[in-house]
Curated annotation (Swiss-Prot):
Main subcellular localisation: endoplasmic reticulum
Assembly information from the UniProt record: Monomer.
Protein family: Belongs to the peptidase M20 family.
Disruption phenotype annotation: No effect on the sensitivity to the inhibition of root elongation caused by IAA-Leu or IAA-Ala.
GO biological process: auxin metabolic process
Binding site for Mn(2+) 2: 137, 139, 197
Domain of life: Eukaryota
Annotated Gene Ontology cellular component terms: endoplasmic reticulum; endoplasmic reticulum lumen
Function: Hydrolyzes certain amino acid conjugates of the plant growth regulator indole-3-acetic acid (IAA), including IAA-Ala, IAA-Leu, IAA-Met, IAA-Phe, IAA-Ser, IAA-Thr, IAA-Tyr and IAA-Val. Is the most efficient enzyme of the ILL family for IAA-Ala. Not important for IAA-Leu hydrolysis in roots. May act with ILR1 to provide free IAA to germinating seedlings.
PROSITE patterns linked to this entry: ER_TARGET (PS00014)
Tissue expression pattern: Expressed in leaves, stems, siliques, seeds and flowers. Detected in the distal tips of cotyledons and seedling leaves, hydathodes of leaves from mature plants, pollen, ovules and developing seeds.
Motif (Prevents secretion from ER): 436-439
Full protein name: IAA-amino acid hydrolase ILR1-like 2
Length: 439
C-alpha cells in the first residue's frame, strides 16, 4: 500500500517537472543564451528592415504632445499585425499593449511618442514633412525599439512567465504625459517599469545607467516685470523694467552659487527675455522665463526664485508676477532608479553586449517624465549609445539631430531581455497564483 502511494507521488512529481520543462524552457536555460537569441532575432534582416521602415515613417510625420493621432494609429496597426491585444485611448493618444499570460507578475516597458516644435535642418530622403515640427529627441526611435521588443516578445510569448505591458506614452516634452497615463491606470497591477533613451554622447553598442538619483527634477518659471515706459532720453520720468529684469537675472544665479551646497547640483537658467520694440523707448514691461533643475530641495528652490524676482523688482520700484506653471507645465520629480532593477539592467547589458558594454553614468541635470512612473513603482531608466567614430551626431533638441538606425535592434533586444529576465527571476522566486487579468 505504502509502495503504491510512493509510486503515485513520484509519478505526479515527474508530470509536474515535465510540465514546467515544456511550458517554461527559459527558466532552466542560461540567461546569456536567451538574450543572444533575442538579439539575433532583432538583428535579422527582416526585423531590422521592418524597424527602419517604421522609424522613418514616424520621423516624416512628427506630432506634438497629445496630438500623436497618426503615430498612435501606426502603433495600433503594427500591434494588430503582430497579434498583440491593446488598450486605447489612454491619456488621449496613448496605447497600452499586453503580451504573455495575462497573469502576474506584470512588468512594463515604456516609449514616448511626441515630437518637438523645431524645424528640421537635416536634408535627407525622410526629412520631416511637417513644417516647424521634428523628432529631435529620438522618440521615433524609442517607439520603434518598443515595437521591435513587442515583435520579439510575441514570437516567444509561450515562454513568458507573466505579462509584459507595453506603454506608448504621449506628451513627454513638458506636458507630463506620464502623469496623465498613470492617472488613467497605465500602471494597474504593474510591479516594475523600464525605459530607454537614445544618447549621442555614449558610444555605439554601450548602455549607461546608475542606481539612485539619475535625472534631475525640473520645473519652469515665467515672470512679468512691470514698470512705467517712456522715452529713453529721459529715463528719470520712467520706471525702467529692463534694469529691474537685468538685476533679477544676475540675482537668480546666486541661488546656486551662494545658497546651494557645492556638492548638491542645482541649475537656475533664464533662457528667454522679451520686451520692447524700439531703440529709443523704455517698455512698460519685460517678460523673463527659464528652467529650474534639482535633485533635492526643489520646492524650496521654487520659492526662492519667486522671492528673488518679486523683491528685486520692488527694489527697482517695479511690480512682478511669477508663474511657476506657465502653459500648464507642472514640475517633474527627479528620476530615481531602483537599485535591484539597476543591478538587473547591468547584468543584462553585459550578457547581451559584452562586459565592456555597460557604462556607469554620472547624474544628469536633464529631466524625464518617466519619473512619474518610477516614483509610483520600482523603475529603471537608461541611456543607449549611438555615437560612432565616423559620424558625428548632434545633441537632442537640435535641428540637426538624427539617430543611428543601427542601434534599433539593440534597444529592442534590451527591452525584451529586461522583461524576460524580470519575469524569469520572479518565477524562480514564486509568484501570485489564482489571479487573472482580463486584457
Amino acid at each position: 500500500m505504502a509502495l503504491n502511494k510512493l509510486l503515485s507521488l513520484t509519478f505526479q512529481l515527474l508530470l509536474f517537472l515535465l510540465s514546467v520543462s515544456s511550458e517554461s524552457p527559459w527558466i532552466a536555460e542560461d540567461t546569456s543564451q536567451i538574450q543572444t537569441k533575442l538579439l539575433e532575432f532583432a538583428k535579422s534582416p527582416e526585423v531590422f528592415d521592418w524597424m527602419v521602415k517604421i522609424r522613418r515613417k514616424i520621423h516624416e510625420n512628427p506630432e506634438l504632445g497629445y496630438e500623436e493621432l497618426e503615430t498612435s494609429k501606426l502603433i495600433r496597426s503594427e500591434l494588430e499585425l503582430i497579434g498583440i491585444k491593446y488598450r486605447y485611448p489612454v491619456a488621449i493618444t496613448g496605447v497600452i499593449g499586453y503580451i504573455g499570460t495575462g497573469e502576474p507578475p506584470f512588468v512594463a516597458l515604456r516609449a514616448d511618442m511626441d515630437a518637438l516644435p523645431i524645424q528640421e535642418g537635416v536634408e535627407w530622403e525622410h526629412k520631416s514633412k511637417i513644417a516647424g515640427k521634428m523628432h529631435a529627441c529620438g522618440h521615433d526611435g524609442h517607439v520603434t525599439m518598443l515595437l521591435g521588443a513587442a515583435k520579439i516578445l510575441h514570437e516567444h510569448r509561450h515562454h513568458l512567465q507573466g505579462t509584459v505591458v507595453l506603454i506608448f506614452q504621449p506628451a513627454e516634452e513638458g506636458l507630463s504625459g506620464a502623469k496623465k497615463m498613470r492617472e488613467e491606470g497605465a500602471l494597474k497591477n504593474v510591479e516594475a517599469i523600464f525605459g530607454i533613451h537614445l544618447s549621442a554622447r555614449i558610444p555605439f553598442g554601450k548602455a549607461a545607467s546608475r542606481a539612485g538619483s539619475f535625472l534631475a527634477g525640473a520645473g519652469v518659471f515665467e515672470a512679468v516685470i512691470t514698470g512705467k515706459g517712456g522715452h529713453a532720453a529721459i529715463p528719470q520720468h520712467t520706471i525702467d523694467p529692463v534694469v529691474a529684469a537685468s538685476s533679477i537675472v544676475l540675482s537668480l544665479q546666486q541661488l546656486v552659487s551662494r545658497e546651494t551646497d557645492p556638492l548638491d547640483s542645482k541649475v537656475v537658467t533664464v533662457s528667454k527675455v522679451n520686451g520692447g520694440n524700439a531703440f529709443n523707448v523704455i517698455p512698460d514691461s519685460i517678460t523673463i522665463g527659464g528652467t529650474l533643475r534639482a535633485f533635492t530641495g526643489f520646492t524650496q528652490l521654487q520659492q526662492r526664485v519667486k522671492e528673488v524676482i518679486t523683491k528685486q523688482a520692488a527694489v527697482h520700484r517695479c511690480n512682478a508676477s511669477v508663474n511657476l506653471t506657465p502653459n500648464g507645465r507642472e514640475p517633474m520629480p527627479p528620476t530615481v532608479n531602483n537599485k535591484d532593477l539597476y543591478k538587473q539592467f547591468k547584468k543584462v547589458v553585459r550578457d547581451l553586449l559584452g562586459q565592456e558594454a555597460f557604462v556607469e553614468a554620472a547624474p544628469v541635470m536633464g529631466s524625464e517624465d518617466f519619473s512619474y512612473f518610477a516614483e509610483t513603482i520600482p523603475g529603471h531608466f537608461s541611456l543607449l549609445g549611438m555615437q560612432d567614430e565616423t559620424n558625428g551626431y548632434a545633441s537632442s533638441h537640435s535641428p540637426l539631430y538624427r539617430i543611428n538606425e543601427d542601434v534599433l535592434p539593440y534597444g529592442a533586444a534590451i527591452h525584451a531581455s529586461m522583461a524576460v529576465q524580470y519575469l524569469k527571476e520572479k518565477a524562480s522566486k514564486g509568484s501570485v497564483s489564482g489571479f487573472h487579468e482580463e486584457l
